[in-house]
Regions:
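Auxiliary N-terminal substrate/complex-recognition segments of SAM-dependent methyltransferases
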Residues: 1-231
Length: 231
């Protein structure tokens, strides 16, 4: 099998101050994904088996666009790709970047607070879900969600830095295709309560694997891969 390292870097532009721009955590995801693409599979899953892919908290759209660009290189990789975000500005930015990368209207972008506004038709559909979540503990100034500004949604993970992730884990069971191989990729931080996060993961019936990490200043940024094991 031939590993592909020539997938184009998505062209990303965004003029909105409230939108999270691609950073080290974004590229931690992309670097891992590049290493796991072969001539006929992604991270051990055959291309033909991947029918639905979700980029949760899409931001500028960089992850969703990356996978849509992969389709242009490997037609057998042809899932329906979705990108969602809580901020309307993110969707505007992501759609502009889709056009910038010459893949207009191929990705379905829509506004949702996690899975809250997802249609019933997407239940039990997704083989691959990627979430680069807000993963840092709340600032004392924005303990209440009513005090959040737009950009705060990109980093504020709750009081312990894990509340958003735990809510995500509880909701996503309804949208994973449990009849096929499925993976959920997410980012976590050593500055959050990782011990409690892991306990919640196990209690909810998932198995988690740390795939990679990078150290930045006083923090480890960790790439994780999750699957549901308790039916």
């Amino acid at each position: 099998m031939i590993t592909i390292n020539s997938i184009p870097e998505p062209l990303i532009e965004c003029d909105f101050e409230n939108i999270y721009h691609p950073s080290d955590d974004s590229y931690l995801l992309l670097d891992y994904f590049r290493k796991k693409i072969t001539d006929d599979s992604f991270d051990g899953i055959m291309f033909e088996e991947i029918e639905y892919l979700l980029d949760m908290g899409t931001g500028t759209g960089i992850i969703a666009i990356f996978f849509q660009l992969l389709n242009s290189l490997k037609p057998k990789f042809n899932p329906k790709i979705y990108g969602s975000d809580i901020l309307e500005e993110s969707l505007i930015c992501a759609r502009r970047n889709e056009i910038l990368n010459k893949i207009k209207s191929k990705i379905v972008f829509f506004q949702s607070d996690l899975f809250k506004s997802f249609p019933e038709s997407l239940r039990s559909k997704f083989n691959i879900i990627i979430f680069n979540p807000p993963y840092l503990p709340s600032s004392p100034l924005i303990k209440e969600s009513l005090n959040k500004k737009g950009i705060d949604h990109s980093w504020d993970g709750g009081y312990k830095g894990i509340e958003i992730l735990i809510k995500f884990f509880k909701e996503l069971k309804e949208f994973i295709n449990l009849n096929k191989t499925h993976y959920i990729y997410f980012i976590s931080s050593s500055n959050s309560n990782l011990f409690e996060l892991e306990k919640q993961i196990v209690d909810l019936g998932y198995k988690n694997e740390q795939l990679d990490k990078i150290h930045l200043f006083f923090e480890d940024i960790i790439l994780n891969r999750l699957k549901f094991v308790k039916y």
